[in-house]
C-alpha cells in the first residue's frame, strides 16, 4: 500500500455528507432517520499493484459505490458498485478485482455476521469441516490451473474474471477488518460463503449415509424455492418472480447492482441487478436481471438417488461459478445452457429458467427462444426450449424436476411410491395451487400476492401444512416448528427489467393475517446483524449511480 499524506490515509467508511445522502435517500426511498449509507472509491495503484480506498464517491476512481445498511429498517441492505469507468485504462481482471475489493471493504461486517450465522447450519462436525476445506482447496487450485493453462479460451477467461473478483472481495474485507482491529475472514471462509448452495449437495456427497430417512427431511433445508413466470392473455405484459426458501439464519440480505465496464468480444452482460447476501458473488436465490436482456430464475431440485452424489469431484466448476460465467457470456437461453453445462460439479442441483426478454414482442408474440429450462444433476445437464408452454400462460417452478430423465435419475418415482403424489411433477401441492391461481394474476399486485401466498389452514391443497404452499412457514408447524421456510419475494416485469428495477420484500410472509416472525421464539439459532422481527413491505430496487 503506497503512503500518502495524512488527509488521504485510509479510514473507515463514513456516512456521506447531507446533500448526497438526501439524493441517495430520495432514490432508494428510505426515510432520513433510517439512513446508514456509506460510500467509497477504490483506486488501483499500478506500481505497488494494490488498491487504495478513499471514503468519497469519485467517478474518476476505478471502482466506486455505496452500501445502504438498511437491513434493520427494510430487511435489505443495498449495494451499488460501478467499476472500470475511471480515468485510467485497466485490464478486465483488475476491474473485477477492484469491484470485488470495494464490495468486501463496504460490506465486511455483514460478511462476518453472515458466515457466523450460516456456518453452524451446515457444519455439524469438525471432521466434515476438514473434508469441505480439502475439497474447496483442491477445486480452487484446479480452477486456477485451468485459467492459466487455457488463457486464450473465452470460457476460462471469464472464469478468471470471477476469480479475480473473489480475490478482490477477500482483500477488501481484510483491509476493513485490519482498520477496525478485527480478525480478518480467511480465504476459505469467503469460499465457503460463495459455495453455500454447492455445499447443500457437497456435504451429503462427503458423508454417504446408508439409510437416510425419506420421511423426516425438511422442505426448506435444501434451499427450496418457488418461482413463477406469468404472461398476460394478450401478451400485454410478462411478469416473473421468485420466493426463496431456506433456513431463516440466511435472512441477512443485500440487493446488489453491479455495472462493470468489461471490454471483451465474448462478454454479453457486465451489468446486472440481483438479490443476494453478504459476501456472495452470486444471487443463490437465483433472481438476476442482466444487461443482455436475460432474466434468470432458479429453484432447487433435491437428488434422492444418493449414488449420483458419488460423482462429485473437485475437478469441476461449482454451480455459482458456472452461473456467473454463463450469465456474463450468454446472449440467449441456449448459449446460457451450453456455457453452464461445462465442467458440471453436480452440486447445487437446480432448475434454471432463462427468460430472454429480447424475444418478447408485447401484444404480438413470444418468439422461439423466449424460455429455456436448464436442469442439472451430477454427471448430466439437460436443457430444452419451452416457450410453447409459456404461451399458454405461465411457467411454474417448485423444486420438482421437469425433464423426465432428470426426474427419474434423481429418484422421484421411488419417492412418489413411498410418500405419494405430493412429490410428482403434476400433483405437488404448489403445482395445483399455481394451476388454480395463476389466472388471477393480472398486474403487479396480484403477482406479489400469489408469491407471498400461504393460506395453509383453509386451502385444501395445503392439508394443514404451512409448507404445502407457495411461501412456506415451517416456524408455524404445530408439531415441530423450526426457523426455516420462505423468507423473501422478488417481482418484476418486462418494463421494470429494462431499467434493472424490481420490487423486493424480506422476511417470512404475513399474508392473510399470519403472525409476524420474531427471532425471540428461536433464539438458539444464530442471527447476527438481523432485526428481531420481520414485518416489512415491498421496496423498490433500482440502480441510481
From Swiss-Prot:
Top-rank lineage group of the source organism: Eukaryota
GO molecular function: phospholipase activity
PTM comment text: The maturation cleavages that produces chains A and B are required to open the putative substrate binding pocket. Both chains A and B remain associated in the mature protein.
Sites carrying sugar chains: 68, 305, 363, 408, 523
Enzyme Commission numbers on file: 3.1.1.-
A single GO cellular-component term on record: extracellular region
Role played: Exhibits a weak phospholipase activity, acting on various phospholipids, including phosphatidylcholine, phosphatidylinositol, phosphatidylethanolamine and lysophospholipids. However, in view of the small size of the putative binding pocket, it has been proposed that it may act rather as an amidase or a peptidase.
Name listed for the protein in its UniProt record: Phospholipase B-like 1
Gene: PLBD1
Amino acid at each position: 500500500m503506497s503512503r500518502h499524506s495524512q488527509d488521504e490515509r485510509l479510514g473507515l467508511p463514513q456516512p456521506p455528507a447531507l446533500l448526497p445522502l438526501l439524493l441517495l435517500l430520495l432514490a432508494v426511498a428510505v426515510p432520513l432517520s433510517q439512513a446508514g449509507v456509506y460510500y467509497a472509491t477504490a483506486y488501483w495503484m499500478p506500481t505497488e499493484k494494490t488498491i487504495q480506498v478513499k471514503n468519497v464517491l469519485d467517478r474518476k476512481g476505478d471502482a466506486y459505490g455505496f452500501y445502504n445498511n438498511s437491513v434493520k429498517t427494510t430487511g435489505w441492505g443495498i449495494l451499488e458498485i460501478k467499476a472500470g469507468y475511471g480515468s485510467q485504462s485497466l485490464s478486465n481482471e483488475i476491474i473485477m478485482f477492484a469491484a470485488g475489493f470495494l464490495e468486501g471493504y463496504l460490506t465486511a461486517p455483514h460478511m462476518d455476521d453472515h458466515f457466523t450465522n450460516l456456518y453452524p447450519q451446515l457444519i455439524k462436525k469438525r471432521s466434515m469441516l476438514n473434508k469441505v476445506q480439502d475439497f474447496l482447496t483442491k477445486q480452487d487450485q484446479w480452477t486456477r490451473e485451468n485459467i492459466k493453462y487455457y488463457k486464450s479460451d473465452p470460457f476460462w477467461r471469464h472464469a478468471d474474471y470471477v476469480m479475480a473478483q473473489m480475490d478482490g472481495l477477500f482483500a477488501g474485507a481484510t483491509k476493513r477488518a485490519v482498520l477496525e482491529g478485527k480478525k480478518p475472514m480467511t480465504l476459505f471462509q469467503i469460499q465457503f460463503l460463495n459455495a453455500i448452495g454447492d455445499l447443500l449437495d457437497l456435504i451429503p456427497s462427503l458423508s454417504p449415509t446408508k439409510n437416510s430417512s425419506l420421511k423426516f427431511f425438511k422442505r426448506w433445508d435444501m434451499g427450496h424455492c418457488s418461482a413463477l413466470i406469468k404472461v398476460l392473455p394478450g401478451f400485454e405484459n410478462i411478469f416473473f418472480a421468485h420466493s426463496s426458501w431456506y433456513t431463516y439464519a440466511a435472512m441477512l440480505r443485500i440487493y446488489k447492482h453491479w455495472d462493470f465496464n468489461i471490454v471483451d468480444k465474448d462478454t454479453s452482460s457486465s451489468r446486472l441487478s440481483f438479490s443476494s447476501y453478504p459476501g456472495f458473488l452470486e444471487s443463490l436465490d437465483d433472481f438476476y436481471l442482466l444487461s443482455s436482456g436475460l432474466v434468470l430464475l432458479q429453484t432447487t431440485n433435491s437428488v434422492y438417488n444418493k449414488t449420483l452424489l458419488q460423482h462429485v469431484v473437485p475437478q469441476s466448476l461449482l454451480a455459482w461459478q458456472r452461473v456467473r460465467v454463463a450469465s456474463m457470456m450468454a446472449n440467449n437461453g441456449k448459449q446460457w445452457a451450453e456455457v453452464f453445462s461445462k465442467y458440471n460439479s453436480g452440486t447445487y442441483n437446480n432448475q434454471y429458467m432463462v427468460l430472454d426478454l429480447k424475444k418478447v414482442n408485447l401484444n404480438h408474440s413470444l418468439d422461439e427462444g423466449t424460455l429455456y429450462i436448464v436442469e442439472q444433476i451430477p454427471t448430466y445437464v439437460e436443457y430444452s426450449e419451452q416457450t410453447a408452454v409459456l404461451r399458454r400462460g405461465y411457467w411454474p417452478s417448485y423444486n420438482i424436476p421437469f425433464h423426465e430423465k432428470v426426474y427419474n435419475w434423481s429418484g422421484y418415482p421411488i419417492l412418489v411410491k413411498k410418500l405419494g403424489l405430493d412429490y410428482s411433477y403434476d400433483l405437488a401441492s404448489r403445482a395445483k395451487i399455481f394451476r388454480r391461481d395463476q389466472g388471477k394474476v393480472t398486474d403487479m399486485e396480484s403477482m406479489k400476492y400469489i408469491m407471498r401466498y400461504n393460506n395453509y389452514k383453509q386451502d385444501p391443497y395445503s392439508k394443514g401444512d404451512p409448507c404445502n404452499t407457495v411461501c412456506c412457514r415451517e416456524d408455524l408447524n404445530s408439531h415441530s416448528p423450526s426457523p426455516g421456510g420462505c423468507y423473501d419475494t422478488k417481482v418484476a416485469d418486462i418494463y421494470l427489467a429494462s431499467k434493472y428495477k424490481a420490487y423486493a420484500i424480506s422476511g417470512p410472509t404475513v399474508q392473510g393475517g399470519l403472525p409476524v416472525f420474531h427471532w425471540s421464539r428461536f433464539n438458539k439459532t444464530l442471527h447476527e446483524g438481523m432485526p428481531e422481527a420481520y414485518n416489512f413491505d415491498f421496496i423498490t430496487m433500482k440502480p441510481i449511480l
